[in-house]
From Swiss-Prot:
Lineage, uppermost ranks: Bacteria, Pseudomonadati, Pseudomonadota, Gammaproteobacteria, Enterobacterales
Function field: Converts holo-ACP to apo-ACP by hydrolytic cleavage of the phosphopantetheine prosthetic group from ACP.
Catalytic activity: holo-[ACP] + H2O = apo-[ACP] + (R)-4'-phosphopantetheine + H(+)
Species annotation: Shigella boydii serotype 18 (strain CDC 3083-94 / BS512)
Family according to the record: Belongs to the AcpH family.
Keyword Protease tagged: no
UniProt-listed Enzyme Commission number(s): 3.1.4.14
Alphabetic keyword roster: Fatty acid biosynthesis, Fatty acid metabolism, Hydrolase, Lipid biosynthesis, Lipid metabolism
Lineage: superkingdom: Bacteria
Single GO BP term: fatty acid biosynthetic process
Keyword Chaperone: no
Entry protein name: Acyl carrier protein phosphodiesterase
Top EC class, one word: hydrolase
């Protein structure tokens, strides 16, 4: 899962949206650095990552990547799941329009920014203003996201080419998303994530 899905599942679980978004920027034990609700959100994010990576639908989807891009498939798929969530938001969350949810999420996250790591502050400088969570619905933007990650982290250069795997298996990936994401939503609503 990427930013939008983590925020969405956190909302459904009544967990800290701030902690769920912050988690990728925190190493080790967060308990000494953040309040308990944010720590709980960080731990939820980490559980979701492990759960998602081990779902049969996700493991199957990783096999569709070519040998040269399979190593980055988990990262690529995380971004792709956000694409489908953004694209189908009105079906998955009809009572909370995406733009309203984004405003709500941003307000939640802004409360922890003063005490956050610089990389997280930097992310927030463009995540909201450039409307990433809405733009995830466009495949051209997904390609830009993957290229951006590859340029910032040279060892992940294969992300550039992984876009072709997404494009080649788009319909099958969308089917897998519909198989697992509603289940995860139900788990979040029952606080079982």
């Amino acid at each position: 899962m990427n930013f939008l899905a983590h925020l969405h599942l956190a909302h459904l679980a009544e967990s800290s949206l701030s902690g769920n978004l912050l988690a990728d920027f925190v190493r080790g034990n967060p308990e000494e650095s953040f309040p308990p609700d944010v720590v709980a959100g960080i731990h939820m994010h980490r559980r979701i990552d492990v759960l998602t990576d081990n779902l049969p639908e996700v493991r199957e989807a990783r096999e569709w990547f070519r040998r040269e891009t399979r190593r980055v498939a988990p990262i690529t798929l995380d971004v792709m799941w956000d694409h489908f969530l953004s694209r189908h938001w009105s079906q998955l969350s009809p009572d909370f329009p995406l733009q309203e949810f984004i405003c709500y999420a941003r307000k939640q996250v802004m409360t922890i920014l003063p005490d956050s790591p610089p990389r997280f502050i930097n992310l927030n400088n463009y995540l909201w203003s450039e409307q990433w969570l809405v733009r995830y619905r466009d495949m051209d933007f997904i390609q830009n996201v993957l290229n951006g990650m590859a340029s910032r982290r040279p060892r992940l250069d294969a992300l550039r080419d992984s876009w072709y795997d997404l494009n080649a298996h788009y319909t099958a990936l969308e089917t897998r998303f519909w198989q697992f994401y509603p289940r995860m939503m139900a788990q979040a609503s029952h606080k079982a994530l």
